């Protein structure tokens, strides 16, 4: 079948995202998602605004951004929900991490062959990668990723699948 993820319905529990420069590195303060194609606080098709004339989408040929989750530090909280209207499969994500990177397979070329010879072209996949913020060591305003000797890092992410 057609692997395009543009019809997938996505919700992300975030009021802010980290804008990037044209090398995909966050360059400064967080920005509100409100009024932009970055806004997934309510359900939207992934492909609905992916080709908008919006600098952040032009830089990465689509979504490749960290969203700052609406949550308390280190508390396991709701992060995102993605569903496929074709299959009815739903994925809900919960995490203790402060952010989630949304990536929409913008640089896939069709060279990768998957199960049963299926080729995966541009935007044939969607990733929700829970994480700290990129470039955190160089941005004192971001949550720290420093781990000192004797300290333990622990993180939990749950990907819960169901069918509608």
Predicted regions and their residues:
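An exposed, glycine/acidic-rich loop-and-rim segment of catalytic or binding clefts
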Residues: 1-164
């Amino acid at each position: 079948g057609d692997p395009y993820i543009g019809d997938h319905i996505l919700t992300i529990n975030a009021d802010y995202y980290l804008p990037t420069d044209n090398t995909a590195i966050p360059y400064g303060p967080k920005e509100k998602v409100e009024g932009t194609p970055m806004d997934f606080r309510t359900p939207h098709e992934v492909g609905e605004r992916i080709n908008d004339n919006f600098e952040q989408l032009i830089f990465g040929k689509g979504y490749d951004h960290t969203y700052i989750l609406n949550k308390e530090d280190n508390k396991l909280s709701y992060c995102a929900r993605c569903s496929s209207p074709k299959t009815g499969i739903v994925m809900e994500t919960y995490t203790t991490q402060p952010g989630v990177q949304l990536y929409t397979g913008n640089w896939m070329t069709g060279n990768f062959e998957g199960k049963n010879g299926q080729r995966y072209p541009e935007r044939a996949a969607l990733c929700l990668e829970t994480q700290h913020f990129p470039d955190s060591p160089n941005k004192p305003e971001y949550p720290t990723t420093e781990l000192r000797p004797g300290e333990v890092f622990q993180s939990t992410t749950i990907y819960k699948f169901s069918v509608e």
